[in-house]
Amino acid sequence: MEQVRNYYQILGVPRNATAEEIKKSFRKLARQYHPDVNPNDKTAEEKFKDINEAYDVLSDETKRRELDSRLFGRFRRPPTSRFSPNSNGGRSPNGTSVNGQVRTPTGRTGTRQPAQSWQDFSETRRTKVVSPARPVPRDVEANLTLPLEKAYRGGKERIRLEDGRSLEVEMPGGMGDGQRIRLKQQGINGGDLYLKINLSPHPLFTLQGTDIACQVPVTPSEAILGGAIEVMTIDGLVKMTVPAGLKNGQKLRLAKKGFPNNQGDRGDQLVEIRVEIPPEPSPEELELYRRIREKETFNPRQKFFDF
């Protein structure tokens, strides 16, 4: 015969505890026995599981009523208040009333009352104890904010749920902003965990569908002469050959360096060129710019004189 677990005792609350009292006790115990606070402590880990199981039942009114029925039954329910002599009175587990004068089987009066009849008492003795139902699997939903690189690569991630549990889950790669993924049997009592992925802002990249947009600074000489420059991608630094005569704001494309779609095909990286002037040119650089000025034929203000 399977014994009914007393979740009130596990959480250290009375049977008539309010929902707020139950939550307060749960949070206190969850912090005390949390695996992060007690690493490699199997006893604390089991206690933490018991606390979560108890809170799952006691925080649900339907499950709590079912637990009360199995724990206390019809005749084993403990009294919560004294009864007046005029009331029917409560019954203790041995079939006698809690207080008041009673009539014995011989017809005499005594200081204790028997149950309503010997038949009632006999029926109580024959009552079958019902085994508790197995914990019902419950799905859990949670939000998870990740940096772009982590969402792209995937891997292990530790998450903390609102009920106090901490889980380490293996995340798949290529998760987009707003995507909802299912982690089997990571919920409560074997249910599933549904995670909504939110991507945190990135200092360099902006996700545009499966394309990744970024700005890349170049020097005046690189813009004029072209050549190979280094560009950061979510895979790391790559060499990119840019054409001569780059304009500020011009956009180039790095094929297959974007974010993957559901089929695993990657988008492109969109590179916007930003021509930057050296803030503190050296004397040699200044001399070269003077010589260029003497030789250059381009006048960007010529259009002002065309009117």
Curated annotation (Swiss-Prot):
InterPro entries: DnaJ_C, DnaJ_domain, HSP40/DnaJ_pept-bd, J_dom_sf. Residues 100-114 have a biased composition (Low complexity). One of its GO terms (cellular component) is cytosol. It is found in: Cytoplasm. One of its GO terms (molecular function) is protein-folding chaperone binding. Residues 88-99 have a biased composition (Polar residues). CDD domains: DnaJ, DnaJ_C. The keyword Nucleotide-binding does not apply. The keyword Signal does not apply. Residues 69-133 are annotated as: Disordered. Residues 6-71 form the J domain. Its cofactor is Zn(2+). It holds the Pfam family DnaJ_C. Keywords: Chaperone, Cytoplasm, DNA replication, Repeat, Stress response. One of its GO terms (biological process) is chaperone cofactor-dependent protein refolding. Its main location: cytoplasm. Binds 2 Zn(2+) ions per monomer. Belongs to the DnaJ family. PANTHER family: DNAJ HOMOLOG 1, MITOCHONDRIAL-RELATED. Participates actively in the response to hyperosmotic and heat shock by preventing the aggregation of stress-denatured proteins and by disaggregating proteins, also in an autonomous, DnaK-independent fashion. Unfolded proteins bind initially to DnaJ; upon interaction with the DnaJ-bound protein, DnaK hydrolyzes its bound ATP, resulting in the formation of a stable complex. GrpE releases ADP from DnaK; ATP binding to DnaK triggers the release of the substrate protein, thus completing the reaction cycle. The J domain is necessary and sufficient to stimulate DnaK ATPase activity. Zinc center 1 plays an important role in the autonomous, DnaK-independent chaperone activity of DnaJ. Zinc center 2 is essential for interaction with DnaK and for DnaJ activity. Homodimer. This is Chaperone protein DnaJ 2. It comes from Synechocystis sp. (strain ATCC 27184 / PCC 6803 / Kazusa).
